Amino acid sequence: KDPFALRRSAIGLLRTIIDNKLNLKLRNLISYNIKLLEEQGVKKINENSENEILNFLKERMKNILKDKNIKNDIIEASISSYFSDNYFDLYKKNTLMNKYINKEAGINAISSYKRAFNILESAKENLSGRPDAVLFRKEEEKHLFEKLNEIRKSFSTNEQDKDYEKLLLSLSEIKIFTDKFFDNVIVNDDNNDIKNNRLELLKMFCNTFNNFINFSKLEGIS
């Protein structure tokens, strides 16, 4: 049921954004329209109106992604972790993940993440994802840390300038570094500080992946 055609209007707006590849900051647009309505005497219902509208649009985005045959777990992984207001950006992440998930790039990325994620789940530690480079004892720790920082710099660029395909392929290529890390580094070191620091490195690793989508929501991770 859609008596006021709100769902249809929202889907129409999102399709226009996607079809025209518009990198719009919808929060600004929504705030501007609310201001115009207030100037005409319409009272703002609550102070959270912008977030409620954005969440409503995000839910409608699920319908569009399903129509594009995006896998359900990819949709959940992206929607649950997305707090921006650029919905073309969200669409790009979904289509790219769907494209690569069963190819070597996707398989490598998921495999690397799963190994780190399962160790963190077993450890059940409260971690920040900020390891101390001073505590690294193995070259493999240093190399993984350096590679993660390189990828994180790419994530920090403006949304419209991000090359998400390149970012996803970078997450896949990090498997070389994680394989060497797991082959040569004992996470549960006898020294508690070193052990915790290695867990922090793995937390940083998972956090980096989750900047793309929440990999923990993908099928076969846990």
Model region roles, listed by residue range:
Residues 1-222:
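Amphipathic alpha-helical "coupling" segments that flank catalytic cores
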